[in-house]
């Protein structure tokens, strides 16, 4: 099948979301439906998908998202999307965002940041994620951010680390 183009999907490298009082939500990651539903639709319509994250490590599925509740209560649909997810070799071995930048962002037609709590761990102030998001904005290419994915837009700020640091400290950035 001839490809219509390429879509870059940014996912988290993190496997634990820091909470108050030193607690950590260890099940944090991407939400199954927020990643697989749009990725399947894009692939079905002829787009090639590239997964990337800050470390190039396998992203974690948010444990709370693997339930039929997020698929209209349909257990068969949940299993179908789990199987689809398992077939995504690029998700198991994502590129590093820095390597994607080095290979050229102009080859991509759109960027997608699925939700789940993962983006809150590392995409919100990742400098490379910021470079990607600024590039897509400057080139007027589609940027889709789902549920918790919009937190990654903070990375596009020129002072992202400062803003995120202030937020974590409880300051009004």
Predicted segment positions?
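Short, thiol/selenol-centered motifs that function as redox-active sites or metal-ligating centers
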Residues: 146-150
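Extended, subdomain-level signal for the structured scaffold at the beginning of enzyme domains
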Residues: 1-139, 152-172
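Conserved, well-structured core segments that form or line functional sites
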Residues: 143
